[in-house]
Amino acid sequence: MNKQILRNVILAGLFLVPFIPFLVSSSFFFPFITTKAFAWMIIEEIIFATWILLALIDVDSRPKKSTILYAVLSFLVVIGLADLLGVAPIKSFWSNFERMEGFITLLHLGMFFAVVSSVFNEIDWKKWWNTSLAASFLLVLYCLLQIIGLKTINQGGVRVDGTLGNSIYLAVYMLFHIFIALLFMWRERQKTFLRWVYGLLILSQASILYYTATRGAILGLLGGILIAALLNIRNKEDRLVRKISIACLVALVVLVGGFSVVKDSAFIESSPVLARFSNLNLDSIKSQGRYFVWPMAWEGVKERPILGWGQENFSYVFQEHYRPEMFNLEPWFDRAHNIFLDWAVAGGFLGLLSYLALYLALMLSIWKSSAGFSYTEKSILTGLIAAYFFHNFFVFDNLVSYVLFFSLLAYVNSRVSGEKSSVQPVVESYKKNIVLPIVVILAALSLYFVNIKPMMTNIFLIDALKSVQTPGQIPAATEYFKKAYSTSRLGRPEVLEHLSANSVPIFSSDISMEEKNSFFTFTKDALLKETGGLDKDARHQLMVGSFLSTTGFLDEALIRLDKAKALIPNKQQIYFEMGAVYINKGELPKALEVFREAYELAPGYVEARVIYLIGAIYAGERVIENEMIAKISEREVVFDDRIIQAYNSNGRKNEVVSLLESRIRLDPANADTYRKYIEEVTK
């Protein structure tokens, strides 16, 4: 084993990491997440295996004992134990395609930390951070193309998201790099050209941060600058820095004070970014998901305070404490949108403390004299930590921000002096005959089962979804679905979800009855098989119930829907599904009763009113029907096809004609179409 070759392999892999944010492939399901995650994990597994071999022959490449190292190990151990003892250990380990986190990601972050903190010296770090800054500038250029309209903003709207697919993810990426650029601008302050390069880079990054319109990150930036400036007021090493810090404090006061004065002006209201700050008040907060999910998360922490629920299990807390007033928010939350609450839910107070210990260890190490940072550098890095900390109060982390955070941990760790964890030489024959084969075999197995097979599942799933939408490709779609389900455990929740969701177009296609029966049997077996491990997952029970209802197994559907209702009793969607089953069974009074329960959960929910009205029409309850019509706007009644269908099914043609005539009055542009419908009804 050649030490230099091994080191070069590791360096090559590490210097690819800054460019991972650019990776997006439409061949993958959740392309902005999975493309980056698979590439990163493959790189980490290769360089970690290489590093194991290097550490055997090079004592200098072995990790050194440090506060940060112990904090990282403690975090991994505590969260690993929490996942193992949590409500869904397999789910906690693998996560899903939408997030690509779970304990498997934490293990890779630990591997990344071990390698980069042991191998990089100060020169390597300088090159690596500057490579990352160069990559951030390329991303700035891409975002500029989005701003001027030459590139599409992936999430829609006006908030730029670059190649990360989410403006919040882009914001924290820019936030990190602003402070790193500031750090290097200070170090290179004597070189005019570099000072200008870093300065312009900071301005460009800050501009993109502004166009993300991410309040948490922007306020985090201001807060980070505030902390750095306050610290530098006591800077005895450089008078100029003290003066600049005072100027920054004055500028912040003027900025905040000035904004509060003009926040209601037409200029502010016309700005999509500034308006998000001016409209931030108690009423707007009450309409956000965080207003509801933060108290939910706290209740979940109190229920399992020591080691929590395990990663990826916030959904169990959500369903237990769901409030019916949340009907106008996204239907399912899998995060608390506060990283500290998320870790408290996932790992209990021990998990939260182990996560906070990472920040504490980082701060202590930065301010250690052995780290060799100047006072100004310490202040800048502390400002970065403060900015990131504040930002995380309102969001959850993603792979890119995790990598940047662990890079910072590794960088500071490499600056702190400490003795190597081991300096014992390893016998040559032991290295060649035992360690080398074991490392190669384990690396190959990991690459195959952790990356290759899940990637195959991911591609099979996206191919299945494309085939469903392509005429004549339904047979191919069914085969892709089967392959996606059987290939890998990672991504199976999404496979099951889309198996169920796409059953109707497959069953209504022109494939043979034998093929339909085969697909039905496969889908039903897959859904019911997974139900054993997801017995307490309300969303899965609802999905199974909906599938069984769609395919005509009404009694079995009610069993699953009753289970879902017991798990999340305040979710109106489940009541709607149950009522539809009762209507299909001809048990109209039961359907009306279920719809009434859904309506009474949140009388302000317009959809619940409409559904209750439909139930009353089917059940022939005219009093309830008239009561609900009085509570729904005319347009909502007139243009809802479900209401017309209910009247038509009950033979009430006069009401159907009346609604269609109202459509002619309210929508004269399509009057001819409505007249044709009237003719068909009155034949």
Show the residue positions of the predicted features:
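Hydrophobic alpha-helical transmembrane segments in integral membrane proteins
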Residues: 259-272, 432-472, 490, 494-495
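TM-adjacent membrane-interface loops and short helices in multi-pass inner/ER membrane proteins
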Residues: 116, 166, 282-283, 289-333, ...
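Canonical positions in the second alpha-helix
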Residues: 484, 529-530, 563-564, 597-598, ...
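Alpha-helical transmembrane segments of multi-pass inner-membrane proteins
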Residues: 2-4, 8-27, 41-53, 72-86, ...
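Amphipathic alpha-helical repeat scaffolds of TPR domains
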Residues: 449-470, 482-512, 533-550, 570-577, ...
